[in-house]
């Protein structure tokens, strides 16, 4: 079960990084009162937790179900395929962190744009595509996949909620660091699968 927790934390890092960026963007927005600013920050944190948590919980479930269908055909190669998927996802996260590649910028979110449900949904899907690929590897871990997806969703929701507040206080300097941690953890889990 510790592998699931590490996987959940690693998969949450993309959403965490975007949430930090959203919180930092919120810090640059002028409000008519401190109460209005607090209210809008709470709304943004709750939206991030809900959207990112649900997307990160559903996508690995889809990957798990697709992987279950293919596992019979690929049984002998499955650990290596899972290893390659996780190492590839980890390397992608490391590359994006080094390049300073931020999803909210790719989606065209600027300081003057408000975050609505459509934009939040788009960001949630964009940050959870990797989780679908990682869901394939749940077939290779001795865990209940449904429980694992619930844990992934809850961990992502918590990281996203607090990421908004952390971003409000710290700005964007933590975004890349979160992605580095996630990338390293995914690579480590991938290597562990074949050892």
Swiss-Prot record:
Key words, A-Z: Cell inner membrane, Cell membrane, Ion transport, Manganese, Membrane, Transmembrane, Transmembrane helix, Transport
For this protein, the parts annotated as crossing the membrane are 4-24, 46-66, 69-89, 123-143, 146-166, 171-191
UniProt keyword Membrane, yes or no: yes
Q: Name one GO molecular function term.
A: manganese ion transmembrane transporter activity
Major subcellular site: membrane
Annotated membrane topology: Multi-pass membrane protein
Instruction: Give the highest taxon in the source lineage.
Output: Bacteria
Per UniProt, subcellular location reads as: Cell inner membrane
Please give an example of a GO cellular component term from this record.
plasma membrane
Role this protein plays: Probably functions as a manganese efflux pump.
Protein family: Belongs to the MntP (TC 9.B.29) family.
Name it.
Putative manganese efflux pump MntP
**Organism of derivation:** Psychrobacter sp. (strain PRwf-1)
